[in-house]
């Protein structure tokens, strides 16, 4: 296997994930088997218990791992399911080292950062590549060079070149070149200092990639090359573009794929990037556009809904449309009257209620679902958004006026949403939900079955992340009131026909909700069926 390590300097949030994923896309387009690893130096075991406002969304893999959002970027850009073990944290590493010490695996040894912690880091990186059957492993080291948390990881990746040989290891360093408008110039000093800091840890970058507002002039590229001792044709400009899916094409135009092949001793191949070119063309020059309202509580931090936004983009590509997002703060909707609701939703073509946890903003989300139902506006509910749809329908159609969820009121009389029985004895928070791929058996003749291309009914898999479910005791009453239970996970103890996975309203233009998170499986060239159908319905609604 060959290894490409991506580090960052100057400031955080430069876009190492997008840069790494874009390079992976270029290598995949050349026919190489590629996988990706994200290293997060925090002490948490995973991203499952972090605040979305601080860390962005928690991306769930097929195996049920709760990971950093960059794993989602890798899956979308590489069009692959990233295997378990590909998000490495300090917490995981130290937990395993301490477990081994207690088990006697290091008997008679003094357990230290070097070699025990660094060896565990290297073992995990190699294992991730082997489990994916990869020829090339991309490893993004989170944080910024100089962070104290990153030191063991930098030492471990330094050792890789000694262990694996020069032709099998490549170091790419991403930095920032700010532009000062007052003096009308790009400033390279931060990049020079960042590369010097990286070298102080024994790592000399083979490639320097520079984030900047605009493409760097040739003289700035030459200056960076001279001061960092990196060849000029190995200094690349990662400048701002209209959409992230332009990044692979922009980097390929500069020769990044070819440079990587040369440095790793790979035979030069011609990339097949036609699908990327077509997708970018549609994104930049769509034939039509729609506006979708997302009624959530993390609207001030769009990264909390990153996969949702990308799924809407993918659905837009499939429908040759630009999808404009209108963020609606669900907390503010809670006290809104009819006039205010009309003001929020009159100009939108669809309403989406995303997943989430906790009571904050819930009544506002219920009002959003009610507006969509009563005004014939296309509605897509995701995870909590499905539970909201059920609560709203129970209250206003099925006559269960005090319907609620046990999550919001554990003493509610009519808990149409309840804690799953399997969760009753669960004590811990981390990694204990119903996670990862689960089968959904779709009923023949339903909208959801049509969307997934199985109109006669069939089983599909989607990813999940939840503790609560539709209470099976209310299914018969809800169905009698006209709510269609269109998909279930069969064979779940105590659930009768099955655990409710999807609901819809038959006489509504498009009212579909899923317990699953289909956004986690959506790809630029393979959009999620519910999202593609939702955007199509929004376009049709727009024409009315």
Swiss-Prot record:
**Residues the entry annotates as binding L-glutamine:** 53, 356, 384-387, 407, 467
Please name the pathway.
Pyrimidine metabolism; CTP biosynthesis via de novo pathway; CTP from UDP: step 2/2
Residues bound to Mg(2+) are 70, 140
Activity regulation details: Allosterically activated by GTP, when glutamine is the substrate; GTP has no effect on the reaction when ammonia is the substrate. The allosteric effector GTP functions by stabilizing the protein conformation that binds the tetrahedral intermediate(s) formed during glutamine hydrolysis. Inhibited by the product CTP, via allosteric rather than competitive inhibition.
Give me the residues that bind UTP, please. 12, 187-192, 223
Range of residues in the leader sequence: none
Q: Gene3D superfamilies attached here?
A: 3.40.50.880, P-loop containing nucleotide triphosphate hydrolases
Q: Which domain of life is it from?
A: Bacteria
For region Amidoligase domain, the annotated ranges are 1-266
Is the keyword Ligase in the record?
Answer: yes
Q: By its UniProt entry, which InterPro entries does this protein fall under? A: Class_I_gatase-like, CTP_synthase, CTP_synthase_N, GATASE, GATase1_CTP_Synthase, P-loop_NTPase
Where the record annotates domain Glutamine amidotransferase type-1, the positions are 291-544
> Per its record, what are the GO molecular function terms?
ATP binding; CTP synthase activity; glutaminase activity; identical protein binding; metal ion binding
Q: Name one GO cellular component term.
A: cytosol
Per UniProt, the keywords (alphabetical) are:
ATP-binding, Glutamine amidotransferase, Ligase, Magnesium, Metal-binding, Nucleotide-binding, Pyrimidine biosynthesis
Additional remark text: CTPSs have evolved a hybrid strategy for distinguishing between UTP and CTP. The overlapping regions of the product feedback inhibitory and substrate sites recognize a common feature in both compounds, the triphosphate moiety. To differentiate isosteric substrate and product pyrimidine rings, an additional pocket far from the expected kinase/ligase catalytic site, specifically recognizes the cytosine and ribose portions of the product inhibitor.
Quaternary structure annotation from Swiss-Prot or TrEMBL? Homotetramer.
As for family, the record states: Belongs to the CTP synthase family.
The entry's protein name is CTP synthase
Lineage, uppermost ranks: Bacteria, Thermotogati, Deinococcota, Deinococci, Deinococcales
Give the gene that encodes this protein. pyrG
């Amino acid at each position: 296997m060959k290894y490409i390590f991506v580090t960052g300097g100057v400031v955080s949030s430069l876009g190492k994930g997008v840069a790494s994923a874009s390079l992976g896309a270029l290598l995949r387009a050349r026919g190489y088997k590629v996988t990706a690893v994200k290293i997060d130096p925090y002490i948490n075991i995973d991203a499952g218990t972090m605040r979305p406002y601080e860390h962005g969304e928690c991306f769930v893999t097929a195996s049920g791992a709760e990971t950093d959002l960059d794993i989602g970027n890798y899956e979308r850009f590489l069009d692959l399911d990233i295997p378990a073990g590909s998000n490495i944290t300090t917490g995981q590493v130290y937990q395993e080292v301490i477990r081994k010490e207690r088990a006697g695996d290091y008997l008679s040894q003094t357990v230290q950062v070097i070699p025990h912690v660094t060896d565990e880091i290297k073992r995990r990186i190699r294992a991730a590549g082997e489990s994916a059957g990869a020829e090339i492993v991309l490893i993004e080291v989170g944080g910024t060079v100089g962070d104290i948390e990153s030191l063991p990881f930098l030492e471990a990746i330094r050792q890789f070149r000694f262990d694996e040989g020069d032709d099998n290891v490549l170091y790419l360093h991403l930095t920032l070149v700010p532009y000062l408008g007052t003096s009308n110039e790009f400033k390279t000093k931060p990049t020079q200092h960042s590369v010097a800091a990286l070298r102080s840890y024994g790592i000399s970058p083979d490639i320097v990639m520079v984030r900047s507002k605009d493409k760097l002039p040739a003289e700035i590229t030459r200056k960076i090359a001279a001061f960092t001792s990196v060849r000029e044709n190995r200094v690349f400009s990662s400048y701002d573009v209209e959409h992230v899916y332009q990044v692979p094409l922009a980097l390929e135009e500069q020769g990044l794929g070819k440079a990587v092949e040369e440095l790793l001793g790979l035979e030069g191949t011609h990339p097949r990037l036609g699908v990327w070119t077509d997708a970018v063309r549609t994104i930049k020059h769509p034939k039509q556009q729609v506006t979708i309202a997302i009624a959530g509580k993390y609207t001030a931090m769009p990264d909390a809904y990153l996969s949702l936004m990308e799924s809407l983009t993918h659905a837009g590509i499939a429908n040759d449309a630009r999808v404009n997002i209108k963020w609606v703060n669900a907390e503010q909707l809670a006290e809104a009257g009819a006039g205010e609701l009309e003001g929020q939703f009159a100009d939108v073509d669809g309403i989406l209620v995303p997943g989430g946890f906790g009571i904050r903003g819930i009544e506002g989300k219920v009002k959003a679902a009610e507006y969509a139902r009563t005004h014939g506006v296309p509605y897509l509910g995701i995870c909590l958004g499905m539970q909201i749809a059920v609560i709203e329908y129970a209250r206003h159609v099925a006559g269960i006026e005090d319907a609620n969820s046990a999550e919001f009121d554990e003493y509610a009389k009519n808990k149409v949403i309840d804690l799953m029985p399997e969760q009753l004895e669960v004590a811990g928070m981390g990694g204990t939900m119903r996670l990862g791929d689960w089968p959904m058996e779709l009923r023949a003749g339903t909208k959801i079955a049509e969307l997934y291309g199985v109109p006669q009914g069939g089983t599909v898999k989607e990813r999940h992340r939840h503790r609560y479910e539709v209470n099976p005791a209310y299914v018969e009453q809800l169905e009698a009131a006209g709510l269609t239970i269109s998909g279930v996970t069969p064979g779940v103890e105590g659930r009768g026909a099955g655990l409710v996975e999807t609901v819809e309203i038959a006489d509504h233009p498009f009212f579909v909700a899923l317990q699953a998170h289909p956004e986690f499986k959506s790809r630029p060239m393979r959009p999620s069926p519910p999202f593609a159908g939702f955007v199509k319905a929004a376009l049709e609604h727009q024409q009315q």
